[in-house]
Amino acid sequence: MPVKLKWPWLGIAIPSFLIASIGYCAHYFILLNFLSLRKQLWYQFCQTMIWLSYYLAIYTPPGKPPTNFKPSKNEWKVYCKKCKCYKPERSHHCKTCNQCVLMMDHHCPWTMNCVGYNNFPHFIRFLFWVIVGTTSLAIFLTTRIHSIWVHRSSPSYLYYKSELIFLTILTPLNAFILLTISILMIRCLFNQIFNGRSQIESWEMDRLETLARMSKLLPILIENVWYIFPNLRNEHVESQAEALLNKKRLSLDELVNFPYDLGPFRNAIQLLGTPPLWLYPFSGPQDDGLHFQKNEESMIEDPNSLNDIILCLPWPPDSTKHLNSTSEHTSNVQIISEEGEQVIRIRTPEKKLSRSEWLNDWGESLEDFGVDVDVE
């Protein structure tokens, strides 16, 4: 679950303190005593890349839409009242940064910045170099501990007391940093590279799966098909809609296609730019972050197949801002006729699955990623 700090500046101070204290204390008190010059230079190179990528992740703007942006045809037209412009696909308004962010992944408290389209490569490189640096240090520290243990019968004056103290402190601390950053890196790679999704979009997929499991998703998708593709509505497609609504079991793959998943390699190119420059500290994505290439499933192959049309809906496919009949908050009042008289009944309230209130298995809401739900 995302961390929320009482004083935001701590988000920069804590990582900076850890990078400096672990990196330079380990070098001065431990590595200088036994490590070769070549390995020391490699270690300091990793430290430099950590600082540089962290600086770029903090100060590189994530990207925001121009005020004259116009959504493409067959895309949701979502207007941000605060930025006074339309949001491009995959964009959200960050409550902390007070701006719409292109391809918003999340607001990161440890950079005091949103992770978005323009600075995602810097964020990933920062995680990468932290993992490389802490892994290298873990190997060096383990080697030193093993050497001291093997020669434990040697006179104590052969070892500096400060070295033993810092070995005791820095070894578990470095291992903890390596573990936590590795978990975050794996999550980012799994979402963005292997599935093509931001953390917000992965959260959306979990929410859609819940709606589908409760049989609440399909009616919204069909209404959205009539809204986005009105020219494809005919008796044949309507009969398919009725048949689908009567079908008891439908998998999520039959209802939802995530349009931006192009495969791991193409996802990486779209996010990080040209492969030879992935580790170059100043490289970034090649496009503008306003429009994104979509996969083949997003193209209508058979206009007479409702299943194909549903998979071509823009993301998220269950948007209800334009609908009156199907919304997140429906009335509990029901009017029916009994023996020629109109009777008002109060229906049993259903469990609310509002997009702004829903929580995933990690206990995360849309607001936890930094999104301003009031303008969603």
From Swiss-Prot:
Protein's recorded name: Palmitoyltransferase PFA4
Pfam family for this entry, one: DHHC
PANTHER family: PALMITOYLTRANSFERASE ZDHHC16
Compartment(s): Endoplasmic reticulum membrane
Naturally occurring in which organism (per UniProt): Candida glabrata (strain ATCC 2001 / BCRC 20586 / JCM 3761 / NBRC 0622 / NRRL Y-65 / CBS 138)
The record's note on its domains: The DHHC domain is required for palmitoyltransferase activity.
Membrane topology: Multi-pass membrane protein
EC number: 2.3.1.225
